[in-house]
């Protein structure tokens, strides 16, 4: 009966390509004991509440890392001493195959041992009986493969996540290729939007075309919810409603990235709305061009500093230094009488306009794991309470405690400047307080820039031994403008 199950869906173009077993070996080398059994469950099929329809499937990333399998309802074990990776697949169901088509079966066992799920409990019992002093490594205490009955299982849930995070943060060449493939799809989608922008009337058309291009190029979709914010919506860091008209607005912030074989891209471009440009030129206002130029400089200088051994926190600080210099030139920031530039820096006044971290790790998750983070990865581009984030409140790699950048890391570099009305009003209300950011802001000048909304430019960058390699090819700068205006 197993012959009915003939399709194996894995990352890459063939079953042999994704280096899952090599990943399992790397993980084992980081564990405290070089013997034991690693167990990881894949994502199970889950029905929506009060429905017979399954929720959209997203494979568990730790499971995928050692298998490359994107089928639901699977499990995997890795016997460290025997170097044996065993994939457990759902028991064959003829009726299910008639309804949903062939799925993963035992016959597709190239470079891995495959069993049906019904044998998992017995296999674990036999392994534990034969290795009574060796641990079964699990990610979380509630992810045990079987309920203990007569066997005293030795579960260990403290080491596996740290070991897997240490491995996942350094990408091998195959993983880099998948991230680059995701970026190529993203680049094609961004190009299509720029070329058609003059025909669009609303944000939904921008977001819709991005998804359309991703799917047409055989991506499974986007790595995260698309952000297509026009005008003041571009000043909301994670604006995802994408349902407002473009008319009367100057700029769009498009933060959108494709996924390829479970690997993410994360790309942001900011561009002028052609219908808002009057009397020739490329920009709807001098202010929009000025802010774009500043952010472009911030990104270019920060990317040039990305290399093995560099501290990302220092690069993040450089982005703020550039912002400080340029915002002082424009008169947006000021040094009041009795104060110094050092006071402005101490107050972190630039965080009013640049309220997020410079970037984050990228990989199987868009906000990927950090080395030995011990926590679920958090988005560095999320504002803290009151819409402002201190430069000391970011998560890795934007922290003083984060380790230096290492070859094989993939990080985003995404500086931005935003004129968020809520944040500006709050700073104005608090400007008389001695420790406020508002003391250093010229609010009359700021009003000229509010209609710009926001500008963010984001690329995905591979750290190499000799510097870095930019994996993102979505147009920006002059190439972006030429596409918009058909030149």
UniProtKB/Swiss-Prot annotation:
Binds 2 manganese ions per subunit. InterPro entries: Aminopep_P_N (IPR007865), Creatin/AminoP/Spt16_N (IPR029149), Creatinase/aminopeptidase-like (IPR036005), Pept_M24 (IPR000994), Peptidase_M24B_aminopep-P_CS (IPR001131), X-Pro_dipept-like (IPR052433). Coiled coil: none annotated. It is an enzyme of class 3 (hydrolase). One of its GO terms (molecular function) is metalloaminopeptidase activity. Mn(2+) 2 binds at residues 255, 266, 458. Belongs to the peptidase M24B family. This is Probable Xaa-Pro aminopeptidase MGYG_06974. It comes from Arthroderma gypseum (strain ATCC MYA-4604 / CBS 118893).
């Amino acid at each position: 009966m197993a012959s009915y199950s003939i399709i194996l869906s894995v990352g890459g173009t063939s079953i042999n390509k994704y280096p899952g077993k090599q990943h399992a070996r790397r993980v084992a080398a980081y564990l405290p004991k070089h013997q034991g059994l690693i167990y990881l469950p894949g994502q199970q099929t889950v029905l929506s509440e009060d429905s017979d329809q399954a929720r959209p499937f997203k494979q568990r990333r730790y499971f995928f890392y050692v298998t490359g399998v994107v089928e639901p309802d699977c499990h995997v074990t890795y016997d460290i001493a025997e170097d044996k990776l065993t994939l457990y697949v759902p028991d064959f169901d003829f009726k299910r195959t008639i309804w949903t088509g062939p799925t993963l079966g035992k016959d597709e066992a190239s470079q891995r041992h495959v069993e049906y799920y019904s044998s998992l409990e017995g296999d674990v019992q036999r392994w534990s009986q034969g290795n009574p002093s060796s641990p079964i490594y699990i990610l979380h205490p509630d992810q045990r493969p079987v309920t203990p009955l007569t066997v005293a299982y030795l579960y260990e849930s403290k080491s596996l996540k740290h070991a897997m995070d240490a491995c996942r943060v350094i990408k091998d060449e195959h993983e880099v290729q998948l991230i680059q493939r995701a970026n190529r799809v993203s680049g094609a989608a961004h190009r299509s939007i720029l070329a058609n922008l003059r025909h669009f009337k609303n944000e939904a058309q921008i977001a819709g075309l991005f998804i359309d291009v991703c799917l047409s190029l055989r991506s499974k979709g986007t790595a995260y919810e698309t952000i297509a914010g026009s005008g003041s919506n571009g000043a909301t860091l994670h604006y995802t409603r994408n349902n407002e008209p473009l008319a009367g607005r100057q700029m769009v912030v498009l933060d959108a990235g494709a996924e390829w074989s479970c690997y993410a891209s994360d790309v942001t471009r900011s561009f002028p709305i052609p219908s808002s440009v009057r009397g020739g030129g490329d920009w709807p206002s001098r202010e929009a061009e000025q802010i774009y130029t500043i952010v472009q400089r911030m990104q270019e200088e920060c990317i040039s500093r990305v290399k093995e051994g560099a501290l990302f926190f220092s690069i993040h600080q450089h982005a703020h230094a550039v912002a400080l210099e340029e915002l002082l030139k424009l008169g947006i920031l000021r040094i009041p009488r009795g104060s110094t530039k050092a006071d402005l820096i101490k107050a972190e006044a630039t965080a009013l306009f640049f309220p997020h971290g410079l970037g984050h790790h990228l990989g199987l998750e868009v906000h990927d794991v950090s080395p030995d983070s011990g926590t679920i990865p958090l988005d560095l581009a999320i504002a803290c309470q009151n819409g402002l984030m201190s430069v000391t409140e970011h998560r890795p790699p934007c922290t003083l405690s984060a380790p230096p950048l290492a070859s094989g890391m993939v990080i985003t570099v995404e500086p931005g400047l935003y004129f968020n009305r809520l944040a500006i009003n709050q700073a104005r209300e608090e400007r008389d307080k001695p420790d406020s950011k508002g003391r250093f802001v010229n609010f009359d000048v700021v009003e000229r820039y509010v209609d710009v909304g926001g500008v963010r430019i984001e690329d995905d960058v591979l750290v190499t031994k000799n510097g870095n390699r930019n994996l993102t090819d979505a147009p920006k700068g002059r190439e972006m403008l030429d596409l918009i205006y058909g030149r």
